[in-house]
Amino acid sequence: MKKAMIYGLGISGTGAKELLEKEGYKIIVVDDKKAMTSEEALNHLEGLEFFIKSPGIPYNDFVKEVQKRGIKILDEIEIAYNYMIEKGLKTKIIAITGTNGKSTTTAKISDMLNHAGYKATYAGNIGRSLSEVLLKEKDLDFISLELSSFQLENIENFKPCISMIINIGPDHIERYKSFDEYYNTKFNITKNQTEDLYFIENIDDEEIEKRAKQIKAKRISVSKFKKADIFVENDKIYHDKDDIIDVDKLSLKGIHNLENTLFMVATAEILKLDREKLKEFLMIATPLEHRTELFFNYGKLKFINDSKATNVDSTKFAIQANKNSILICGGYDKGVDLAPLAEMIKENIKEVYLIGVIADKIENELKKVGYEDNKIHKLVNIENSLQDMRKRFTKDSDEVILLSPATSSYDQFNSFEHRGKVFKELVLKIFG
């Protein structure tokens, strides 16, 4: 019997386990909290065909020992893709990565294709593994697949028909030796693409432009600011000379969503979707939860949940769309440069409530740029911050309360979804 080891029983690991067991593999599960520990697993490495590492697990001593023994390390994405090839599945993969905007783009491309009459779904770093989707959903025309840099580290055969990198900004410095290593890992999404396949290229992004020339796939350019295959001019989206839609008719608002929309339009044009169907969809598409989500009004006081903002660039977009708001910010310390965040807050934010283990560092950066002490409230967590606001604000307070943390949630929460859910529940409890 063929044998494989799975390290980490999260969404990816569970999906890979189910798929491989269906294919007759004996699976050894290693999970320091739920199954065999990594220390015990050292005695079970003989005879493995390969080793699957969950994306969130770093290259720790156990993984390095697996590497040292010459055992092939794969990700769940590679396992699932190989399964598709072996079974002769005709489903096409549209692969999406980027620092920000990838979840919205992934989900909305799937919705757009369904609206156009195809059978499509989404998978990947968006709550459902590719393996799970392949086992449960049959006869799909397309899978819109969100990929994090972690999921792209061990690509061998994976080859999407369309790939895209929405944008690249500093993130995950705790995982990679340098930002260059992080950026280059993102480009593994194009590694096996050939001239008959497509890469959608954001020519507004300097880091993408630096690396795009090495890509073999046909490049389709998008831009918010200059001429491209898909571009914005005079508040309209164009494909070459063809007017696709007025920007003010888009249901997804904000400069960040305009960028996401350009990738949707590029995908639609590559696949030759009916333009009227495309236009219809762009006028009714709804935003995802936890992404600049206005979810509650307490009289004039508005609450926006942007818990998905797990890096500085993402919070920048939220601040640009909600200037002069009161910001709740902070969380896990990812080791990134906080000076740009401090400048952004100084220029655009009325007051800031700092939470999480990174609060002191943000406060120090704010003081360096001259942000007034009386505008900084350091109250440890979301609940304390909201309780303080309840004492200060009434239904007549014409303010926007924006949760946009600029970092990960792992110091106090299980995920950004958990953080956003708790924020919404606390707002309703305290102000509802």
Curated annotation (Swiss-Prot):
Keyword Aminoacyl-tRNA synthetase among UniProt keywords: no
Localization per record: Cytoplasm
Pathway: Cell wall biogenesis; peptidoglycan biosynthesis
Main location (coarse class): cytoplasm
Binding-site residues for ATP, renumbered to this chain: 98-104
Family: Belongs to the MurCDEF family.
Function of the protein: Cell wall formation. Catalyzes the addition of glutamate to the nucleotide precursor UDP-N-acetylmuramoyl-L-alanine (UMA).
Keywords tagged on the record: ATP-binding, Cell cycle, Cell division, Cell shape, Cell wall biogenesis/degradation, Cytoplasm, Ligase, Nucleotide-binding, Peptidoglycan synthesis
Database matches in Pfam families: Mur_ligase_M (PF08245)
UniProt-listed HAMAP family: MurD
PANTHER family in the record: UDP-N-ACETYLMURAMOYLALANINE--D-GLUTAMATE LIGASE (PTHR43692:SF1)
Record carries keyword Transcription: no
UniProt-listed GO biological process terms: cell division; cell wall organization; peptidoglycan biosynthetic process; regulation of cell shape
Domain of life: Bacteria
UniProt-recorded name of the protein: UDP-N-acetylmuramoylalanine--D-glutamate ligase
Catalysed reaction, written as an equation: UDP-N-acetyl-alpha-D-muramoyl-L-alanine + D-glutamate + ATP = UDP-N-acetyl-alpha-D-muramoyl-L-alanyl-D-glutamate + ADP + phosphate + H(+)
A single GO molecular function term of this UniProt record: ATP binding
GO cellular component: cytoplasm
